[in-house]
Amino acid sequence: MSQPLTVECPTCGAPVEWTAANINRPFCSDRCKLIDLGAWAAEEHKIPVSPDAEDELFSEELPPRAH
């Protein structure tokens, strides 16, 4: 049987075995998983978007919605 893949925990950098038995993957612990969740909730992490993508999304060319 081959060695399981080992990755770094995104929060603390500890080595983590990527196996089905590790319920916290890619994190090393529940604590690191919750720290990451808190960072997303506090908007410390963001998904990059091009500056004009929001303009296209909310374009005035769209018909007004019926209320």
From Swiss-Prot:
Binding locations of Zn(2+): C9, C12, C28, C32
Stretches the record annotates as Disordered: 48-67
Cofactors: Zn(2+)
Pfam family, one: YacG
GO biological process: regulation of DNA-templated transcription
Family listed: Belongs to the DNA gyrase inhibitor YacG family.
Subunit details: Interacts with GyrB.
UniProt name for this protein: DNA gyrase inhibitor YacG
Top-level taxonomy: Bacteria, Pseudomonadati, Pseudomonadota, Gammaproteobacteria, Pseudomonadales
Annotated gene: yacG
